[in-house]
A protein has these predicted regions:
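C-terminal beta-signal and adjacent terminal beta-strands/loops
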Residues: 531-532, 588-591, 595, 689-696, ...
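Outer membrane beta-barrel strand-and-loop segments of large Gram-negative receptors
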Residues: 405-417, 460, 553-559, 565, ...
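Gram-negative outer-membrane beta-barrel transporters
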Residues: 585-588, 607-694
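Outer-membrane beta-barrel translocator/receptor signature
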Residues: 182, 197-199, 210-280, 286-293, ...
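N-terminal periplasmic accessory domains that precede
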Residues: 94-98, 139-142, 159-162, 174, ...
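Short, acidic, small-residue-rich periplasmic hinge/interaction motif at the N-terminus
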Residues: 31, 43-47, 76-80, 90-132, ...
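Flexible loop and strand-edge segments within Gram-negative outer membrane beta-barrel domains
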Residues: 273, 279, 284-286, 306-370, ...
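Short acidic/polar hinge/loop motifs at secondary-structure boundaries
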Residues: 62-64, 178-206
Length: 767
């Protein structure tokens, strides 16, 4: 009896000991990222316990009776991408989050996982869910989701972004904090970046991005991977996309985990497609193939010192439309006016033959971040890049497998960046950046190179001051860049070696102001002065540029460009239903460098090609970007975007060539109510009208601009929630009316129509 009493007494004492760890709770607020308003009926769910709660009208939730342990929290809301967070619980916690319910209007900049809302720069971001949905596209095509951005193309698989009428060397592409190197001068040289590596793609349209690079007159594109999570379990994503036009396939796998002492992430991507199809014929030899990969490793040596190692590989092989390479000038002029390209085949093929491109790009980055004190943070970065580009022409005597252009570029970057937090409302960011480039031609081509061998040294220093005072935010910045070219070229006349040295000193300044006029109105103004040195192709190109099917002639006497730009932005939010953003801008560019088509077709042993030469003038570009989002109910959203731009040669009183036409885009989206397992089901109908570029003289190009066109598309998306994973489906139709059209910004519009109807299906699995 005494023994039984002791056992019962022990059990009574044990009950509160067992129950005590399950007395914890989690509570917090869920708000909208762009409006800062509370979100109602957000579901917060603990996967391991299969319990959850919904937010009330204040955006508040509570979950009780939680034991000590590690949990995966799933946060879902209609119209938002489901958020999954790993949360260790050892006590009662306050856990609040923001969701991207109106992602169209988010103007934050995500840099290494940190939101930079305190900036006057005009910016917008593309979120991970959009990148995954359209992962079969390249970077430039993805950026067209942002108002004011279009693409200059060289066929169906090669494109690069045009921001406020500027492209190429005037656009800075920042890949994980490093200026993307390579042969960026060519309009047929698409950025060698796999969009799947990015968690956010941010676009800064102002001139205030002095911390990244000098000479970016058009804007800055930031490609930012996701910060590595503090998650001890293996997680990942797999994506597959197939499309009918070109019979393309895209596959991607991503894995990440926190191991003892470090965290890691790896991913791989494979893409392949064949000849695309217009409504009437195949575009022969327009296939492409990509194999890409990336690896990221991060370790915390102490609370103050964090080290990150990143490597990425991008490889691609792109076919160039066979009908764009013609044998003589008479046939070329006939081909330009022909309704159908020469050499068009009647059958589909995955084969990629000459003319074609093969490119590989390696990026290695080592970053160390050290917090010297609560107010001083330093970053020390080394990066190396290797870019190998080969271009193949249709050559006689079976020599098409020998590249006509073979370039190898190595680049080294060293940076030191410091942030000084003077107080809660003032900060200074400063840094010094050094870059060394070695660019050489492989002699295997047997052809005088388009671009000569050269070395380049560039050093830059910048400083940015930011201050917030009541409802006002101020930003001032300055930058100095020193750039030196050492060029070794071969003369076209007597075949002698010629050496040139070019030295440039560039100064850039910016000032910005932002005013939170009311709770619903925000105004910002950014003014900048930017200098840009001419690049190697503008100075010294001399020969056939295969990707544009033309002969380019550089000008060794080109001077620096000097640009003065003003961009204003007004954001208006009314009753959490109507959102309006207006962003007018004007940019004056002295000594603007442009590629002028000459009234000449030149015969060479490689065929007949039009001639282009680099010239300078004074230019003015004005425009306005407008976006309107109306959400009358939680299930219905209307989106309207309009981009107007006009460019003029103020010196010669003529229009600028290569400026995009006006573009109007609209969409209507309907969201279905969430079911037990089915979430975020949306149907979207969209239309795009591109105006004819009438602001151009008929003598300025080989052909007049193509007529205006309208494209209709649709998109269906949904996801199925499993216990600890998510399965997502999407179906898209592009050019669903199978419209025949040509785009002014496609350099191959001289020879062919654009792609016809395209059915795209994608599936993703998050685990």
């Amino acid at each position: 009896m005494n023994k039984l009493f002791k056992i019962l007494l022990g059990l009574l004492w044990a009950v509160p000991l067992w129950a005590q760890p399950c007395s914890f709770s989690i509570s917090g607020y869920i708000t909208d990222e762009s409006t800062q308003k509370p979100l109602v009926n957000v579901h917060i769910f603990i996967e391991e316990l299969q319990i959850g709660s919904f937010t009330n009208e204040l955006g508040f939730y509570e979950i009780h009776h939680i034991c000590s342990g590690n949990y995966h929290i799933r946060i879902s809301h209609i119209g938002c991408e489901t958020l999954k967070v790993f949360l260790p619980v050892t006590e009662t916690l306050t856990f609040s989050k923001v969701l991207h319910h109106h992602a169209e209007l988010i103007d934050e900049i995500i840099i290494h996982g940190e939101k930079q809302n305190n900036t006057t720069q005009s910016s917008q971001a593309i979120k991970k869910e959009e990148i995954v949905l359209k992962g079969n596209k390249n970077l430039a095509d993805l950026l067209e989701e942002i108002t004011g951005v279009q693409s200059i193309k060289n066929g169906s698989g090669i494109s690069k972004p045009v921001i406020h009428g500027l492209t190429g060397n005037r656009i800075g592409i920042i890949n994980n904090g490093i200026v993307q190197s390579g042969q960026q001068w060519g309009n047929d040289h698409a950025p060698e970046i796999d969009p799947f590596v990015a968690h956010h793609i941010s676009l800064i349209k102002g001139t205030g991005a002095l911390a990244y690079s000098g000479g970016s007159l058009g804007g800055i594109v930031l490609i930012e991977p996701k910060e590595l999570d503090n998650e001890p379990h293996l997680h990942g994503q797999t994506h597959y996309i197939t499309e009918s036009n070109g019979r393309g396939h895209t596959a991607n796998l991503q894995l990440e985990k926190k191991s003892k002492g470090f965290s890691w992430r790896t991913l791989g991507t494979f893409k392949q497609s064949g000849d695309t199809h217009t409504p009437d014929y195949y575009l022969t030899n327009t296939g492409k193939k990509e194999i890409n990969g990336a690896f990221q490793l991060e370790s915390h040596f102490s609370e103050k010192w964090k080290s990150n190692l990143y490597y990425s590989l991008f490889t691609t092989e792109n076919g160039i439309l066979r009908g764009s390479h013609i044998g003589n000038s008479e046939d070329l002029q006939q081909a330009i006016r022909a309704p159908k390209p020469y050499f068009t085949q009647d059958d589909f093929s995955y084969s990629i033959n000459a003319p074609k491109q093969k490119v590989s790009h390696h990026l290695l980055k080592w970053k160390n971040k050290y917090q010297f004190s609560d107010k001083i943070i330093g970053e020390f970065i080394y990066a190396g890049q290797i870019n190998n580009r080969k271009e193949f022409d249709v050559r006689r005597s079976g020599r098409s497998d020998i590249p006509a252009l073979s370039l190898l570029q190595t680049q080294h970057t060293i940076e030191g960046l410091f942030t000084f937090q003077l107080n809660d409302r003032k900060s200074i960011k400063t840094g010094i950046q050094n870059q060394l480039i070695d660019n050489s031609n492989n002699p295997e081509t047997g052809i005088l190179p388009l671009i000569p061998d050269y070395n380049s040294i560039q050093s830059g220093i910048f400083g940015i001051f930011q201050q917030q005072k009541n409802n006002w935010f101020y930003e001032y910045g300055t930058r100095y860049d020193f750039k030196h070219f050492n060029v070794v070229s071969i003369s076209r006349t007597n075949r002698s070696i010629e050496r040139f040295n070019h030295l440039f000193n560039n100064f850039s300044f910016s000032a910005g102001i932002k005013h939170f006029t009311t709770e619903h109105i925000k105004n910002s103004l950014n003014i900048g002065w930017v200098s840009r040195s001419p690049e190697i192709n503008e100075l010294h190109s001399n020969g056939l540029h295969q990707g544009i099917s033309g002969i380019e002639e550089g000008n060794k006497n080109l001077k620096q460009e000097h640009a003065f730009k003003i961009i204003g932005t007004t954001d208006i939010k009314i009753n959490n239903h109507l959102f309006i953003q207006v962003a007018p801008y004007i940019q004056n560019i002295n000594d603007y460098i442009y590629l002028q088509p000459e009234n000449e077709f030149r015969n060479t042993i490689r065929g007949a090609f039009p001639v282009f030469s680099y010239q300078q003038t004074n230019a003015r570009i004005i425009g306005n970007d407008v976006m309107i989002v109306y959400e009358p109910t939680e299930n219905l959203k209307l989106n309207l975007r309009h981009a107007y731009i006009k460019g003029d040669d103020t010196q010669n009183k003529t229009p600028l060539i290569g400026i995009p036409a006006q573009k109007l885009f609209g969409s209507i989206s309907f969201r279905l109510s969430d079911k037990i397992h089915w979430k975020n089901s949306t149907a979207t109908l969209n239309g795009q009208y591109v105006f004819k570029q009438n602001h151009l003289l008929i003598t300025q190009d080989f052909l007049p601009p193509p007529p205006a066109y309208f494209l209709l598309g649709t998109q269906l998306t949904t996801q199925y929630q499993l216990k600890k994973s998510v399965l997502k489906w999407n179906l898209r139709v592009e050019n669903m009316l199978n419209t025949t059209y040509r785009d002014y910004l496609n350099r191959l519009r001289y020879f062919s129509d654009e792609k016809g109807i395209n059915f795209i299906m994608g599936v993703s699995y998050d685990f």
